Amino acid sequence: MVAQPSPIVGRLKLPESMPSLVSLEELTATKVLVTFLTIVIIAPRVFTVIKNAFSPISSIPGPLLNKLSPWPLTIATIKGTSHHFARSLHEKYGPIVVLAPGMVAVADTKEIKRIIQTEDWTKSEAIYGNFRQDPQRPTLLAYTDKKAYAKRKRMLSSMFGIKYIRSMEPIMMTCVEAAVRQLNKFCDEGTQGVAVVDMQHLIHSLAIDIIGITTFGGSLNVVDNGSHPLPSRLKAGLRIAGLMQLIPWIRFIPFLPTRDPYVDRFTYDIVDGRRQELESSQHSDLLQKLVEASDDSPGSDFRTSDVQDESVVMLTAGSETTANAELFTLMMLLKNPKVMKKLVDEVDQWYPPSEPDRQTDCGYSQAGMVYLQACIDETMRLVPGQATGSPRETSKDDVVLGYRIPAGTTVFPNTQEGHTQDAHWEEPQKFVPERWLEAQATNVPYWPFSAGSRVCIGKHFAFQEMHLTLVTLLRKFKFEYVDGQDESTVFRVAQQLKAESYRMKVSRR
């Protein structure tokens, strides 16, 4: 019998050049995948890089990578260091630099003034278009259309006039008094009347309560209770909003709601409840004005959802920026004891220690307490809330510092850099409030609240809150510096401390 070859042996002896059916299928699938990736993903990106390389702004100073890719700026934004990123570029390359394709930063004070004030360029759609709960219904902060913005601002402006803001002073003071009670409690529990207090938490809690009572008609009692779900949810939303300005694809993440369900329910219930009370009672707060102006009829420009969105912006942007300004002011004072003593002397002049029950009153002392205002101004010069400036957009081809800027380019008027230039300030990096008492101080480059038509509508509200808070705290308590803390800042919509807490020694005066 002749032995038959084993099927395995026979298979092994097949010519190596003869591909199997499986390998042909694998080869075809690989080619299809490579072709797909090349056409859909790689080729468009290569085209974009080539386009960026030949863009007019590629001639502007800055790293080559910034001109070709948005990733350096994106990474800085994710880390919260975009203001440091811009500063380092200006230090190396000069007053105009490329941040990313289609985005430049300008630190020249004459050009900053032209952009935000003289010519009043429109806000950048590339940035503020991603800062909206509803893309079709922006808030006052996120409008880029000038006519629509002007209409909304006219509607809201009466709420932020000095007269109406003064009428809210008594309810604002109830929140400040709660903070005083809390500090007294800490001092009672401290060693020999001295307590180490997380003043970052206390000041932010106070600012939230003040905005809460003026915007929602009732304090959120964060100072008394230590926390509240709404501020923590809004702070998380603020982080996402900061990222979405430069990373807009975040909003397309599956199952990510356009509104936080808790915030949406909370604000809707507040607004609906106030609407039902309109005929029976009146309130002296911002919510009253917002609800009175709203109308849910078809075609309305200001519906209940708009009231919700505007109130959320007021609560987040208003509390965050004001609290940070107050905290940074106290920090500057603690690191400059002579300035602190001079300010406390001014406080005692206007509110003598022999009259401890005298109520802090903006109408009485705000205009006269010039050194307090100088300390606040000097703090906001060095640490402005809008660290890189409010981004604007060229509506037509323009020339900035000799460089052509194509229409549609986002331009960051870097106000923080403009605030610290040797040409305008003696020892610009030093905290010297006295510089604001000089006659020429009114003509210096200074834009902590922006300028032009987009100047912050809440400016007077913020100053009143800062005055009430700082004067009351300095009347009642002595603050001392605690060494060894992280004082670096991050920028997420507003400039703030990187650390989650900042401690100070507190005792009664």
Curated annotation (Swiss-Prot):
Keywords noted in UniProt: Heme, Iron, Membrane, Metal-binding, Monooxygenase, Oxidoreductase, Transmembrane, Transmembrane helix
Keyword Ligase: no
Subcellular location: Membrane
Keyword match Coiled coil: no
Entry membrane topology: Single-pass membrane protein
Loss of function: phenotype: Abolishes the production of lucilactaene and NG-391, and leads to the accumulation of prelucilactaene A, prelucilactaene B, and two isomeric mixtures of prelucilactaene E, and prelucilactaene F.
Enzyme's top EC category: oxidoreductase
Principal place of residence: membrane
Record EC number: 1.-.-.-
Superkingdom of the source species: Eukaryota
Annotated metabolic or biological route of this protein: Mycotoxin biosynthesis
GO-annotated molecular function: heme binding; iron ion binding; monooxygenase activity; oxidoreductase activity, acting on paired donors, with incorporation or reduction of molecular oxygen
Xref: InterPro entries: Cyt_P450, Cyt_P450_CS, Cyt_P450_E_grp-I, Cyt_P450_sf, Cytochrome_P450_monoxygenase
Cofactor or coenzyme needed: heme
Residues that span the membrane, as ranges: 30-50
Residues that coordinate or bind heme: 456
Annotated Pfam families: p450
GO cellular component, one term: membrane
Recorded family membership: Belongs to the cytochrome P450 family.
Protein task: Cytochrome P450 monooxygenase; part of the gene cluster that mediates the biosynthesis of the mycotoxin lucilactaene and the lucilactaene-related compound NG-391 that act as cell cycle inhibitors with potent growth inhibitory activity against malarial parasites, moderate growth inhibitory activity against cancer cells, and no activity against bacteria and fungi.
The name this protein goes by in its record: Cytochrome P450 monooxygenase LUC2
Organism of this sequence: Fusarium sp
Higher taxonomy: Eukaryota, Fungi, Dikarya, Ascomycota, Pezizomycotina
